């Protein structure tokens, strides 16, 4: 169970159907959906970030514990062929449905969220954190420098790299020949993915075109042992 107080915010694990329903409602609002509930919710720990002054829910995400042998049950496995990760020797967790309330963009919210994630990973002895990192919209032309940067610096190791499964993908690693403009790439890189990369994360060599969610997304993996020591210290300082 997560119970983390930092400044104006409190991170906790959902303990009731009402807590999960509140997270689903925030997700629906953030993702522009009428509702947002799926078969994966029951398998996950839901982490909620509330504002302490009035208990307003300002951020949420979910964590699904897995191992290599059951990675095919993950949300990401709908879109990526993950058989190479079936032999991964260590505990995994899929982090998903991360969102922050559109009216609350305080950077401290993200710090507390990452502190809560760190507390969960440490408590469960997780070795691999993974998920789908999304770009808003489905126009690949908007993100060519970002994708070129991913190709140049952040592709996953070949022995773990997901294969293509989804019907619509952008094979950016094979198609792009441009040298990335680093400034433009970072400006267009989604904040969540940018944080993963700062932690030593790696990505798939293709992006999935998700028409239902109106996003492009890449599979993202963070091997906990590969996180830079200074970054680990910062995260654990927040986690308390």
Pin down the residues of each PLM region.
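C-terminal "cap" of GNAT-fold acetyltransferases
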Residues: 214-227
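Short loop segments at secondary-structure junctions
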Residues: 52-54, 103-104, 224-227
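Nucleotide-cofactor and metal-assisted catalytic machinery
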Residues: 62
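Short, cationic low-complexity segments
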Residues: 238-240
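Short amphipathic alpha-helix that is part of the acyltransferase structural core
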Residues: 2-59
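Long, contiguous binding/interaction regions
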Residues: 226-235
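Acyl-donor binding region in acyl/amide transferases
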Residues: 66-202, 207-215
């Amino acid at each position: 169970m997560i119970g983390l107080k930092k400044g104006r915010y409190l991170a906790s694990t959902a303990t009731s159907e009402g807590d999960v329903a509140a997270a689903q409602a925030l997700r629906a609002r953030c993702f522009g959906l009428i509702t947002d509930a799926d078969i994966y919710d029951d398998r996950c720990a839901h982490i909620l970030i509330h504002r302490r002054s009035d208990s307003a829910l300002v951020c949420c995400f979910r964590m699904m514990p897995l191992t290599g042998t059951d990675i095919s049950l993950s949300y990401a496995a709908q879109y990526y062929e993950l058989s190479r990760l079936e032999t991964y020797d260590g505990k995994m967790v899929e982090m998903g449905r991360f969102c922050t309330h559109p009216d609350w963009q305080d950077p401290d919210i993200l710090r507390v969220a990452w502190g809560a994630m760190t507390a969960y990973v440490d408590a469960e002895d997780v070795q691999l954190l993974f998920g789908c990192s999304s770009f808003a919209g489905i126009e690949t032309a908007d993100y060519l420098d970002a994708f070129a940067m991913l190709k140049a610096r952040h592709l996953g190791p070949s022995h773990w790299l997901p294969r293509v499964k989804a019907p619509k993908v952008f094979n950016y690693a094979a198609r792009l020949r441009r040298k990335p403009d680093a400034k433009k790439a970072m400006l267009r890189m989604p904040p969540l993915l940018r944080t993963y990369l700062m932690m030593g994360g790696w990505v798939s060599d293709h992006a999935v075109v998700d028409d239902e969610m109106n996003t492009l997304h890449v599979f993202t993996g963070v091997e906990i042992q590969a996180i830079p020591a200074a970054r680990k210290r910062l995260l654990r300082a927040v986690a308390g």
